[in-house]
Amino acid sequence: MVDGRPMQITLNLPDRLNQIGEFDQNDWLREIAIALFEQEHISLARASKISSMEIMEFQKLLSDRGICIHYDVEELAQDIQHLQNRSWL
């Protein structure tokens, strides 16, 4: 709730969902996380955690959907640390 009112989110689901016979709980959590991130209700790290995805994997998913990645200095530092931990940087 925000200021005593329930929070409203809008989900823009991809057209491919019409072609999928089974859409499980993980799929719904991923779509909700994307929507919350895109509407700046949660951080990139939180969205990737909700999606049960690595941050870099979640960033790639956002990029594939044309969603801009917005994050603060702390999240940038976390990304750099993540890359260093994997010896990618």
From Swiss-Prot:
InterPro entries: UPF0175 (IPR005368), UPF0175_domain (IPR052264). It comes from the Bacteria. Disulfide bonds: none annotated. Pfam families: UPF0175 (PF03683). PANTHER family: UPF0175 PROTEIN SSL1255. Belongs to the UPF0175 family. This is UPF0175 protein ssl1255. The lineage of its organism: Bacteria, Bacillati, Cyanobacteriota, Cyanophyceae, Synechococcales.
